[in-house]
């Protein structure tokens, strides 16, 4: 029992495999689990159990994802692997599986392929901060120069999308070789694990970030003032803190004079908790659902941004028909819908259900946002798409 307790204090990091179809993402996932279980203890997983990924629904979107776990001496990893290309696209855009780092798998026999590029671009758009490269199938390439050439190509491709291509770790290995217990290739899996430990920094915990709470409801309490309720997304709210009310209207600041949870008064509310915050001197009609309460200066309201969007297919309950420029749906951010105009990339006339697309959105009223914020696209309360803010313009 004491051992189990000790394990739990290890830092937790979320990673995943990305890359072109058949380059060996799932085989690598199995090889990591198996090799690390052999060396450091833990549960081995075979290819079949990972490849048979269960379907999940995230905001109405069907995604097949396999979740595996493994340990290094320093950390505990949660790792996602998807069977199909479409699953990766959906996963990255919805943030169903947030990654602190990605393992880009490239077959040495093929070099970078179209989906290699697309996954790198998506990684950039959705904010995967770190990428480590695993060059797979190196046991099938005899020519040392060819391996160097592929490595150079991959590094250049990553640099093209603003990843530090020259500096990031590239490990040349064979996932199948490691899975079959061949020592020289098992050593490469250990090398990959060491790269994960050293190259991907420990993610900041939600509680250590600046305070932010999306406002879900507003009440006025006779003689005490206005209370806003919501679930704290990040940081800590203490009684006496100055807070900003951001989005929809002009930003205002006030002081939090009380924090309560389940009708009990607290000194503070923390990330993940549902609380009510009493605001000094704020009138009931000055705040509304859809705004956020935040540490002053930590987040700003915006109306225009570039986004990466996945459009639900008909089977997922999405649209049955394409949409064109001039489409004006609602964009659902955190707790509220805001109407917006879209512009499509040059040369794109229409967007079909099931597509993923980059679009520039201009909202009719400002919303508190950072790059990486997720949203849904809705028509009359029905979700027809999912997106992520890639770049803020105004």
Swiss-Prot record:
Gene Ontology MF annotations: GTP binding; GTPase activity; guanosine tetraphosphate binding; translation elongation factor activity
Span of domain tr-type G: 10-204
UniProt-annotated binding residues for Mg(2+): 26
Protein residues bound to GTP: 19-26, 81-85, 136-139
Annotated segments matching region G2: 60-64
One Pfam family cited in the UniProt record for this chain: GTP_EFTU_D3
Keyword vocabulary terms for this entry: Cytoplasm, Elongation factor, GTP-binding, Hydrolase, Magnesium, Metal-binding, Nucleotide-binding, Protein biosynthesis
NCBIfam families the UniProt entry points to: EF-Tu, PRK00049.1, PRK12735.1, PRK12736.1, small_GTP
Function: GTP hydrolase that promotes the GTP-dependent binding of aminoacyl-tRNA to the A-site of ribosomes during protein biosynthesis.
Stated name of the protein: Elongation factor Tu 2
């Amino acid at each position: 029992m004491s051992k189990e307790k000790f394990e739990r204090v290890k830092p937790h990091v979320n990673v995943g495999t990305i890359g072109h179809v058949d380059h060996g993402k799932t085989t690598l996932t199995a090889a990591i689990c198996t090799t690390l279980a052999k060396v450091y203890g833990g549960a081995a997983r075979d290819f079949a159990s990972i490849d048979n990924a269960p379907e999940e629904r995230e905001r109405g979107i069907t995604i097949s994802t396999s979740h595996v776990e493994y340990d290094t001496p320093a950390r505990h990893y949660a790792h996602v692997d998807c069977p199909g290309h479409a699953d990766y696209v959906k996963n990255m855009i919805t943030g169903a599986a947030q990654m602190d780092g990605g393992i880009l798998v490239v077959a040495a026999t093929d070099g970078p392929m179209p989906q290699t590029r697309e996954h790198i671009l998506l990684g950039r758009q959705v904010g995967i901060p770190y990428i480590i490269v695993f060059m797979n199938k190196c046991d099938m390439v005899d020519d040392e120069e060819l391996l160097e050439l592929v490595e150079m190509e991959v590094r250049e491709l990553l640099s093209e999308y603003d990843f530090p291509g020259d500096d990031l770790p590239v490990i040349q290995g064979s996932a199948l070789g490691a899975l079959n217990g061949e020592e020289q290739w098992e050593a490469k899996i250990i090398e990959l694990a060491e790269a994960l430990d050293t190259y991907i920094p420990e993610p900041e915990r939600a509680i250590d970030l600046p305070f932010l709470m999306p406002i879900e409801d507003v009440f006025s309490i006779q003689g005490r003032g206005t209370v806003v309720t919501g679930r704290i997304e990040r940081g800590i709210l203490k009684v006496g803190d100055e807070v900003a009310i951001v989005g929809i209207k002009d930003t205002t600041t006030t002081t939090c004079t009380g924090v309560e949870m389940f009708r009990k008064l607290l000194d503070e509310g923390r990330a993940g908790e549902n609380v009510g915050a009493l605001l000094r001197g704020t009138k009931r009609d000055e705040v509304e659902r859809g705004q956020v309460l935040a540490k002053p200066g930590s987040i700003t309201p915006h109306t225009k941004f570039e986004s990466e969007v996945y459009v639900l297919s008909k089977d997922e309950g999405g649209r049955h028909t394409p949409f064109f420029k001039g489409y004006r749906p609602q964009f659902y951010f955190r707790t509220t819908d805001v109407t917006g105009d879209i512009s499509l990339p040059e040369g794109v006339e229409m967007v079909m259900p099931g597509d993923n697309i980059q679009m520039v959105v201009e909202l009719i009223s400002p919303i508190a946002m950072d790059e990486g914020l997720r949203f849904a696209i809705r028509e009359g309360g029905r979700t027809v798409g999912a997106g992520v803010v890639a770049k803020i313009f105004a």
